[in-house]
């Protein structure tokens, strides 16, 4: 099972240990690839539309026409059981790709192109935190799929 997560930017030093923790935990469940793409520009010097357009181009280049699930503030909120069901169903179809927007969100074009949009919360998170939360939910989802205990 291959899963790819496409996200603008990179992981910061203070979140690196959580990032590495979940990457290690997920190894036994899937072949996970995190694809970091360039941020669209300096938010102090470049307009939001230009930044989102630049990030869209980077993301589309990585997608290469594949369908994807978008993590989006305006997406459907689902619980962990629904997420594990989504994970199981998508993996039965083949590979799975998630896209996370950058610091300014995601372009309307990518929003329209997404196969499915889900929200991690009504709260707004940085793209780095969204990545960590997604990795945790992937781990939790695989534990649920495999009928394994998660909380000890």
Swiss-Prot record:
InterPro entries: Alpha/beta_knot_MTases (IPR029028), RlmH-like (IPR003742), tRNA_m1G_MTases_N (IPR029026). One of its GO terms (molecular function) is rRNA (pseudouridine-N3-)-methyltransferase activity. Pfam families: SPOUT_MTase. Its main location: cytoplasm. It comes from the Bacteria. Disulfide bonds: none annotated. Its EC number is 2.1.1.177. It catalyses: pseudouridine(1915) in 23S rRNA + S-adenosyl-L-methionine = N(3)-methylpseudouridine(1915) in 23S rRNA + S-adenosyl-L-homocysteine + H(+). GO terms for cellular component: cytoplasm. Keywords: Cytoplasm, Methyltransferase, rRNA processing, S-adenosyl-L-methionine, Transferase. S-adenosyl-L-methionine binds at residues 71, 101, 120-125. It is an enzyme of class 2 (transferase). It is found in: Cytoplasm. Belongs to the RNA methyltransferase RlmH family. Homodimer. Specifically methylates the pseudouridine at position 1915 (m3Psi1915) in 23S rRNA. This is Ribosomal RNA large subunit methyltransferase H. It comes from Thermosipho melanesiensis (strain DSM 12029 / CIP 104789 / BI429).
């Amino acid at each position: 099972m291959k899963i790819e997560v496409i996200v603008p930017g990179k992981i910061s030093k203070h979140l690196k240990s959580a990032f590495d923790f979940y990457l290690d935990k997920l190894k036994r469940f899937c072949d996970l690839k995190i694809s970091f793409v360039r941020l669209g520009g300096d938010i102090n010097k470049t307009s939001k539309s230009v930044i989102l357009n630049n990030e869209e181009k980077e993301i589309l280049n990585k997608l290469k026409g594949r369908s994807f699930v978008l993590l989006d503030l305006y997406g459907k909120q689902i619980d962990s059981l629904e997420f594990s069901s989504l994970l199981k169903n998508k993996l039965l179809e083949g590979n799975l790709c998630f896209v996370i927007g950058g610091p300014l969100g995601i372009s309307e074009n990518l929003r329209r192109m997404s196969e499915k949009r889900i929200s991690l919360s009504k709260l707004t998170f940085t793209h780095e935190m969204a990545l960590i939360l997604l990795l945790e939910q992937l781990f939790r989802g695989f534990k649920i799929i495999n009928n394994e205990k998660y909380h000890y």
